[in-house]
Amino acid sequence: MNWKLIFQLSLFGLFMGIATVFVIPSKIEPLFWLAIFLLCAYIIAKQVPDKHFVHGLMVSIVNSAWITTAHILLFSQYAANHQQEVEMMKSMPLSPRAMMALMGPVVGIVSGLVLGIFAFVAGKLVKPRLPARA
């Protein structure tokens, strides 16, 4: 496993966690994620010789930690810009922050399955970068 690459690619999650609080509206957020997933899948396929699916899965799980943390820490600002999501959370048995903390990892796993599939397919289509010769 290339943990350095997983961490580096997960920084898209940190960016999106903050950007979705302040800049990116919910309606267009999926387009950003599609672009990020395609880019991550390509990079994984280029940089990693095998286990593409697992690398994609792990990137999304780490992404979910960044995003969940950002949304919980910036909850007041998140709530001001995402009223529809907050309204949905009000009907849940736990507080909105607790629901975010519980659902964040679930979303990370589900999105990780998607990114994992993208990375697996990219691994079949993209030739990996050859290691430098000594």
Predicted regions and their residues:
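Juxtamembrane/disordered regions of integral membrane proteins
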Residues: 1-134
